[in-house]
Amino acid sequence: MSDYVIECHNLETAYVGSLNRPILNEISCHIKQGEFVVLLGLNGAGKSTLLRSLVGLVPLVKGEVHINGVAMNSRILPQIRRDVGMLFQGGGLIPQLSAIENVLCGRLGTRTTWQTLFGFPKRDRLLALELLEQLGLRELAYQRTSKLSGGQQQRVAIARALIQSPQILLADEPTTGLDVIATQQVMETLAELHTQQGMTVVAVLHDLGMAARYAQRAIVLDAGRIVYEGSCDNLQAQFVVNSQ
């Protein structure tokens, strides 16, 4: 059995006329179980597109994505999306709902209409409360998310991603729009999931210092191609070299 939980083989998306190239162009990379990997690059490099392709949210014209050794296809996509938690840029919460209700939304994909018609099962609600408690938000469980701070909202979004008990967590610019304190709280949460629970974390970041502090490995993209893959040491030099 492969040591890799994520494998990308020659991924290519459709040609984009405004860019004169595909957004992703012959992308191949591998991520091991329990790694914390960051995707870096300038705006438009293809970071978020690559991340979303890992859960079938981006159509590919060429290449394959393998999750846990299985090639992604429409038949197994629902299972893959249960195994892979996704933290979208901005959180994607419903502001009118409470924190716990937003977390429970993460269960909608595995519950039938009849199961949710009269509310979520008690075990789901208990799990949601447990996750919020682990993230320091137990006392805010019934507060509308619109009244929470940016950092608190992002931690609610993390809890929502975790309610499926995923093996892998994908985070698309999880600190965008957050202040320094909230940014640190979110990154510490991701780091704890990695170090304490052995979760595989793949995050799109812009802050090179943050990447070097928390991640084990970096994948740097430029114009839809991987230009560096390796240690997070001296990442600034990689951007200087690749811009010349």
Swiss-Prot record:
Q: Name one GO cellular component term.
A: plasma membrane
Enzyme Commission code(s) on record: 7.3.2.2
Tell me which residues make up the ABC transporter domain: 6-244
Give UniProt keywords alphabetically.
Answer: ATP-binding, Cell inner membrane, Cell membrane, Membrane, Nucleotide-binding, Phosphonate transport, Translocase, Transport
**What reaction gets catalysed by this protein?**
phosphonate(out) + ATP + H2O = phosphonate(in) + ADP + phosphate + H(+)
Intracellular or extracellular location(s): Cell inner membrane
Membrane-related topology note: Peripheral membrane protein
Q: What class of enzyme is it?
A: translocase
InterPro entries xref list: AAA+_ATPase (IPR003593), ABC_transporter-like_ATP-bd (IPR003439), ABC_transporter-like_CS (IPR017871), ABC_transpr_LolD-like (IPR015854), ABC_transpr_PhnC (IPR012693), P-loop_NTPase (IPR027417)
- Thylakoid recorded as keyword: no
Q: Where does ATP bind?
A: 41-48
Q: Write out the function statement from the record.
A: Part of the ABC transporter complex PhnCDE involved in phosphonates import. Responsible for energy coupling to the transport system.
Annotated protein name in UniProt: Phosphonates import ATP-binding protein PhnC
Q: What is the native source organism of this protein?
A: Trichormus variabilis (strain ATCC 29413 / PCC 7937)
